[in-house]
C-alpha cells in the first residue's frame, strides 16, 4: 500500500507538474524550471520553509482546512498527536485528489474557453472581412445609385424636351387639321358651286337645244312612214332627251378615250424608236473596231445611201397626202430609215478614222519606191566598182609575184610596190570611209523626211476625219449639245497642228508642205444661230418643207403638233450626257 501510494503520489506530482507547465505563465514557468534544476532535497526544503515549518504546522493545517472549506471540500486534514510531527495521509491525499480534479476541470474549462475564444476571434475576423466587403458593396451601390440618379435626371430632361416637342407637334397638327378642315369646307363649297354651275350650264345647253329645235323652220310631215322594225318611236319628253344627252356624252367620252389611247400608243411607239436611236447613237459614238472596206465599196454605199435618202424624201412628201394613221406609220419608217443611214455614215467615218489611227508606223515611214530603187542601184554600182578595183589589185600582185627577178631586185621591187600600194590603199580607204559617212548621213536625212511626211499625212487624215465628223454632227439634232465638246476638241486639234505645220514648212520639201498647209480646219462660228426643231427635222428629211408641200391647214397644224412631240422626246438624249460623253 505504501508503494502504491508513493507511485500514485509520484504520478500525481508528475501530472501536476505537467499541468502546471501547461497552465502557468511564462515567468512562473521559468521560476519553476529554475527551481527544478536544483537538487530535490534543497527545493522541497525551500518550498516548505516558504509556507510551513516545523513550528507552524498546526497553523498551516488550520489555514489549509479553511481554504478547503472555502473551496467547498468536505475532507479536512488532521494533525497527528502532539508527540508526532506528521499529517494524516488519507485526508491529505483526498484533499490533494480533489484539488487535482478541480485543477483538471479548471484546465478543461480553460481549454474550452480558449477554443471558444479562438472561434470568437475567427468569427470576429470573418465578421470584419464581411463588414469590409459589405462596406465596399455599399460604396459601389452608392456610386451606382448616384449614376442611376444622373441617368434619371438626363432621362427626365430628355422627357421634358420630348414633351415640349410633342406639344409643339400637337399644336402644328391642330393647326394643320384646322387648315385641312377649312380647305375641305372651301373645296366642298367650290365643288357645290361647280356642280350648280354645271347644272345651270346643262340646263342652258338643253334649253338652247330645245329652243333651236323649236325655232327650226321645217315642214310638218303628216302620215309619216313608220320605222322599219315596226316599233313606235318614243315621245320627246325631258327624260328621253336627258337620256339621249347622256348617251351623247358617253359616246363623246368613249371617242375621247379611244383617241387618247391611240395617242398614248403612238407616243409609246415613238418613245421606243427614240430609245432605240439613243442606244444605237451611244453605241456608234463609242470606239468601235475598224472594218476593212474598200474605197469603191464605200463610194458605192454613199451613192446608194444618197439614192435611198432621195427616195425616202419623196416617199415622206407623198405620205402627207394620205390618212393620219398611214402618215404616222410612214413618218416612223422614214425616221428609222434616216437613222439607219445616219448610223451607217457615222460607222463609216469611225472606220476611216480608226484605219488612219491604227495604221502601223512602218507603213507610214516607208520610203517611196522609185527613190529606194535608185539608191539601191547606186549602192550596187559602187560595190561593183570596189570589187573590180580589188580584183585588179589582186591580179597585179599575183603577176608581180609570178615574175622571176633576182632576190635583191625582187625584194626592192616588192618593197616599193608594197609601200606604194599601202599608201594608195590608205587613201582609198579614207575616201571610202568619207563616202560611207556621207551616204549614212543622206540616208538618215531621207529617213527623217519620210517619217515626217508620214506623220504629216496621218495628221492631215485625222484633221480631215475630225472636220467631216464635225460637219456631220453640226447638221444633226445634237449640234447644241455637241457644240462645247467639239469646240474643245477642235481647238486641241488646231493647237496640235500649228507646230506640225511650222516643222513641215521648215524641213519638208516645198511641194509637200504647201500641199499640206493649204488645208485648214474650219472652226465653228459662235455667232451661228441655233436651228429650231422643225429646221432640224427638215434638214434630216424627217418632214418636207412647207413651201414644197401642198398640204392643207389641218395637215400643217398636225405637223406642228408632231414637231412639238419630237422636240419634247428628243430631250431624252441628254440623260446620259455626263456618263457617256460624245467626244
Curated annotation (Swiss-Prot):
Compartmental location: Cell junction, Adherens junction; Cytoplasm, Cytoskeleton, Microtubule organizing center, Centrosome, Centriolar satellite
Biased composition (Low complexity): 504-515
Coiled coil (residue ranges): 108-220, 255-333, 420-453
Chief subcellular location: other
GO CC, any one term: adherens junction
InterPro entries membership: Adhesion_Centrosome_assoc, Afadin/alpha-actinin-bd
Region (Disordered): 285-328, 480-527
Feature: compositional bias, Basic and acidic residues: 305-328
Any one biological process term the GO annotation gives: intraciliary transport involved in cilium assembly
Domain of life the protein comes from: Eukaryota
Keyword annotations of the record: Cell adhesion, Cell junction, Coiled coil, Cytoplasm, Cytoskeleton, Microtubule
Listed Polar residues bias regions: 484-494, 516-527
Family recorded in the similarity comment: Belongs to the ADIP family.
Biological role: Belongs to an adhesion system, which plays a role in the organization of homotypic, interneuronal and heterotypic cell-cell adherens junctions (AJs). Involved in cell movement. Acts as a centrosome maturation factor, probably by maintaining the integrity of the pericentriolar material and proper microtubule nucleation at mitotic spindle poles.
Name recorded for this polypeptide: Afadin- and alpha-actinin-binding protein
Organism whose genome encodes this protein: Oryzias latipes (Japanese rice fish)
Name of the gene: ssx2ip
Amino acid at each position: 500500500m505504501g508503494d502504491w501510494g508513493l507511485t500514485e503520489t509520484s504520478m500525481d506530482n508528475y501530472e501536476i507538474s505537467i499541468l502546471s507547465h501547461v497552465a502557468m505563465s511564462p515567468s512562473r514557468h521559468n521560476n519553476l524550471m529554475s527551481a527544478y534544476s536544483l537538487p530535490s532535497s534543497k527545493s522541497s526544503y525551500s518550498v516548505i520553509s516558504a509556507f510551513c515549518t516545523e513550528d507552524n504546522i498546526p497553523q498551516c493545517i488550520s489555514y489549509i482546512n479553511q481554504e478547503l472549506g472555502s473551496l467547498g471540500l468536505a475532507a479536512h486534514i488532521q494533525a497527528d498527536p502532539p508527540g508526532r510531527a506528521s499529517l494524516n495521509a488519507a485526508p491529505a491525499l483526498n484533499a490533494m485528489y480533489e484539488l487535482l480534479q478541480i485543477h483538471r476541470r479548471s484546465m478543461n474549462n480553460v481549454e474550452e474557453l480558449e477554443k471558444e475564444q479562438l472561434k470568437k476571434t475567427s468569427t470576429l475576423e470573418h465578421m470584419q472581412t464581411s463588414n469590409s466587403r459589405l462596406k465596399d458593396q455599399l460604396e459601389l451601390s452608392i456610386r451606382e445609385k448616384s449614376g442611376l440618379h444622373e441617368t434619371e435626371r438626363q432621362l427626365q430632361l430628355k422627357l421634358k424636351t420630348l414633351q415640349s416637342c410633342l406639344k409643339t407637334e400637337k399644336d402644328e397638327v391642330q393647326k394643320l387639321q384646322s387648315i385641312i378642315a377649312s380647305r375641305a369646307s372651301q373645296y366642298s363649297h367650290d365643288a357645290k358651286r361647280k356642280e350648280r354651275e354645271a347644272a345651270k350650264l346643262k340646263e342652258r345647253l338643253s334649253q338652247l337645244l330645245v329652243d333651236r329645235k323649236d325655232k327650226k323652220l321645217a315642214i310638218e310631215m303628216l302620215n309619216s312612214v313608220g320605222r322599219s322594225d315596226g316599233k313606235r318611236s318614243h315621245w320627246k319628253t325631258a327624260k328621253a332627251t336627258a337620256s339621249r344627252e347622256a348617251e351623247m356624252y358617253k359616246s363623246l367620252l368613249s371617242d375621247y378615250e379611244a383617241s387618247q389611247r391611240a395617242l398614248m400608243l403612238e407616243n409609246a411607239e415613238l418613245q421606243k424608236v427614240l430609245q432605240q436611236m439613243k442606244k444605237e447613237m451611244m453605241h456608234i459614238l463609242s470606239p468601235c473596231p475598224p472594218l476593212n472596206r474598200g474605197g469603191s465599196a464605200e463610194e458605192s454605199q454613199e451613192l446608194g445611201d444618197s439614192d435611198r435618202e432621195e427616195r425616202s424624201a419623196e416617199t415622206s412628201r407623198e405620205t402627207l397626202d394620205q390618212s393620219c394613221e398611214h402618215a404616222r406609220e410612214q413618218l416612223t419608217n422614214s425616221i428609222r430609215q434616216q437613222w439607219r443611214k445616219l448610223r451607217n455614215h457615222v460607222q463609216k467615218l469611225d472606220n476611216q478614222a480608226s484605219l488612219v489611227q491604227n495604221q502601223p508606223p512602218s507603213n507610214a515611214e516607208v520610203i517611196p519606191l522609185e527613190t529606194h530603187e535608185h539608191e539601191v542601184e547606186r549602192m550596187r554600182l559602187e560595190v561593183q566598182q570596189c570589187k573590180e578595183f580589188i580584183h585588179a589589185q589582186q591580179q597585179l600582185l599575183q603577176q608581180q609575184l609570178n615574175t622571176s627577178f633576182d632576190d635583191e631586185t625582187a625584194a626592192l621591187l616588192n618593197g616599193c610596190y608594197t609601200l606604194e600600194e599601202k599608201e594608195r590603199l590608205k587613201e582609198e580607204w579614207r575616201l571610202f570611209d568619207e563616202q560611207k559617212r556621207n551616204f549614212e548621213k543622206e540616208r538618215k536625212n531621207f529617213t527623217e523626211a519620210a517619217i515626217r511626211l508620214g506623220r504629216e499625212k496621218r495628221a492631215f487624215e485625222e484633221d480631215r476625219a475630225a472636220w467631216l465628223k464635225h460637219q456631220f454632227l453640226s447638221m444633226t439634232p445634237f449640234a447644241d449639245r455637241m457644240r462645247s465638246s467639239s469646240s474643245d476638241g477642235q481647238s486641241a486639234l488646231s493647237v496640235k497642228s500649228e507646230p506640225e505645220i511650222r516643222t513641215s514648212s521648215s524641213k519638208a520639201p516645198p511641194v509637200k508642205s504647201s500641199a499640206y498647209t493649204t488645208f485648214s480646219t474650219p472652226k465653228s462660228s459662235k455667232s451661228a444661230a441655233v436651228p429650231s426643231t422643225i429646221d432640224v427635222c427638215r434638214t434630216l428629211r424627217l418632214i418636207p418643207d412647207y413651201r414644197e408641200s401642198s398640204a392643207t391647214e389641218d395637215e400643217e397644224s398636225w405637223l406642228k403638233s408632231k414637231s412639238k412631240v419630237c422636240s419634247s422626246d428628243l430631250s431624252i438624249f441628254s440623260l446620259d450626257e455626263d456618263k457617256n460623253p460624245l467626244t
